[in-house]
Every structure is written in structure tokens, then in C-alpha cells.
């Protein structure tokens, strides 16, 4: 058995550590990235933490350009993995899926392939490019597990669990995500700044009363009392799992909410207003062409560097309301992750941890034959039971909290 991991950023760091801790099942591990030095740094950390469970298994680094399908196919054929785990940025998903199809090897990723902001890449068409592989993968006898992070990913498994055990009829699904931790910086992103800052500046698109609705970012807000973290303002925004939840778990309203502090929003709004968040090319006086968002990315702290001093909790969950046995019911299925615990385990912060742990939990379901049917699948389509039974032992627990039924007080912010 063996895996090929592509990507050596923050998520890739955690994925590699967790794969190493479970290499008795996953087998040999090859980590590949455009920068082989990043792969080697991860390997050094794994060995330094004694996280390689079976020292007889291989742990190697390779160089690859994840945009180059021919190079990817060549690497896959050389490594001969049973599963390719894509821990790279979203825009390489389709190239890696095509390479896996050509090499006839199964595939897993942690997010949708588009930015959710650009025309033709928004929530209603979010998975079109990857769902186009369904027949190809099925005919080739290989599996693709899409968006196996936390959100997207585990939150969809929570919804599937709710539909299977807790509800006869679902009215609303609200995915809620806050980071109650503190990294000590005035402004920083917890994962790739380019991906993060594109994601949160687009219009919010959500499903309501049989249609997609759209509002400007940060203009729909509610307050929610998170267990162990307290009350937080969360804002409606576009997110990957809205499309797949709408496809596989019918509900009257499906919406994603993320917590932002006032200071963060002040910085964000200022940078957006002066054009620093633009991904479009800009020509300087000397003729140099730059993209403001990429310049900003180069100036911001590397998300990996935030880990050593990070303190506090994250809380991410799925708030489901509907009926069970004819009675109204409201439940919040959630997880807490602790930044300090994550750093002690894998030398990284909890944001990356909550993506990397589910990816390896899903990979284990593939290797154990639980999630290995040929075809292309989102997490909602798969049996939630073995995944939720396994995830606590990989590093993330989960709980169910009963709430008083009643729709949230959603406020319009101008």
C-alpha cells in the first residue's frame, strides 16, 4: 500500500504528519510539491516528532509542477500509489484528477476546484468541472473523494448523520465556522492568503426557497452562542459545500456562516477598497506587471509561521433544524480544535489541523474498503458511520448539542 501526497503547504504539513501516524494502513508515503525543500522540511518535522508509526515504510520527497498533467502522470506511474491525496491549492484539482484518470489511480482532495468569486466559478456551478469525471472514474474502476476537509467535508458528514439518524425532514442547514484563537498578529490569514482573501470577498450565495440567492459579502449576519467559545457574529458567505449539500440533502434553506472580528473586517474592507485584494494584473510605472493580491500575499505572514504562538479554540459545526417523529427539532453537531494541542501533535495550527485530520480519516475509509466504490463522490453521499467512528482517534472529536427549535435572527448589515 502507498499514497502520493501533492502539496506541502499548511494543509499538506498536517496531512503528511497524520499519514505518517497511520502508515501501518496507508503504507509508503511520497510527498511532492513544486518546492522539494518544503517536502523535506515536513519529513524532518515528522521524524523529529517521532510521528512515523512504522519505520520500515518509505517516506520520500519528490518535485512536481501540479499544473503540468504530463509531469503528474509520469510521477504517479513512477510512485505507483493506491491513492493520490491532493493537498494543494484548489486550482490544481482538475489537473490532478485528469492525471489520476490517465494513470488509473484513485483521488482525494479537500476543497472545490474554483474560487467561488469569478464568473462561471460560483456556487451553482462549483463542482461542475469535477463532477464531469463521474463516468470516467466509474468506468476506470477508480474512486474520487471530493472536499474531504472540515468545511467542506466533515460538516457535510454531520449533515448526512443528521439526515440518517436525527431527522425525518430537514428544513434548514446552517454551517457555522469560527476561530476563537489568537495568533498575536494584527492581520494574517490562517491558510493560503490568495485562496482565503478571494474566497471571502465574493458575494454570498445561498440556497433558499428553491432558488439560489445572492447578497454582497458581510451583509447578512447572525449571532450564535458557540459551546466553550461564547457568542460570535458570523457572516453569510459563499462556500463549497452549499452546492453539494443542495444536491444530496434537500432542505428549504442552506447557508454558510463564518466569524470575523471587527478588526479583521476593518483591515479587509480597507484593503479591498484601495484595490489590494484584486487578482487582476496591474502595470507599474517601470513596466513591471503585478497582481495586487499576490503582492499582499508576499507581505503577509506565512500561515505556517503562526503555529508556535497560537492559542485558543476553533469551533465548526452544522446546525440542522427540521422534524423528528412529527416534532420540531434543532441540533448543532460540532467539533472543537485547540491550537496548542495541534501544535504539540504536528507542529501546526488548528485551522490546517481541521483540514488535514479529515483528509486522512477519509483516506483510511478508502483503504479499508468503506469508501472505495468506483466513481466520484462528495462526502454527503458516503456512509457517515465509519468516518465519524474513526475521526476522534485521528485527532478530532465531535458532539451533538440539542437547541430550542426556531430560525435564527438574521440581520442585514449595511
Swiss-Prot record:
For whether the record's keyword set contains NADP, the answer is yes
Q: Which InterPro entries match?
A: CANSDH, NAD(P)-bd_dom_sf, Sacchrp_dh-like_C, Sacchrp_dh_NADP-bd
Q: Kindly report, in one word, the top-level EC class recorded for this enzyme.
A: oxidoreductase
**Single Gene Ontology MF annotation:** carboxynorspermidine dehydrogenase activity
Q: What is its EC number?
A: 1.5.1.43
User: So what does this thing catalyse?
Assistant: carboxynorspermidine + NADP(+) + H2O = L-aspartate 4-semialdehyde + propane-1,3-diamine + NADPH + H(+); carboxyspermidine + NADP(+) + H2O = L-aspartate 4-semialdehyde + putrescine + NADPH + H(+)
Asked if the Swiss-Prot or TrEMBL record annotates the protein with the keyword Cell membrane, the reply is: no
Q: Which domain of life is it from?
A: Bacteria
The record's Gene Ontology biological-process terms are: polyamine biosynthetic process
Loss of function: phenotype = Deletion of the gene abolishes norspermidine and spermidine biosynthesis, and results in increased accumulation of diaminopropane. Deletion leads to a reduction in growth rate of planktonic cells and severely reduced biofilm formation.
Keyword terms = NADP, Oxidoreductase, Polyamine biosynthesis
> Any stretches that span the bilayer, and where are they?
none
The family this protein is said to belong to: Belongs to the saccharopine dehydrogenase family. Carboxynorspermidine synthase subfamily.
- Role of this protein: Involved in norspermidine biosynthesis. Catalyzes the synthesis of carboxynorspermidine from L-aspartate 4-semialdehyde and 1,3-diaminopropane. Is also active with putrescine as a substrate. Essential for biofilm formation.
Protein name, UniProt field: Carboxynorspermidine synthase
Identify the species of origin.
Vibrio cholerae serotype O1 (strain ATCC 39315 / El Tor Inaba N16961)
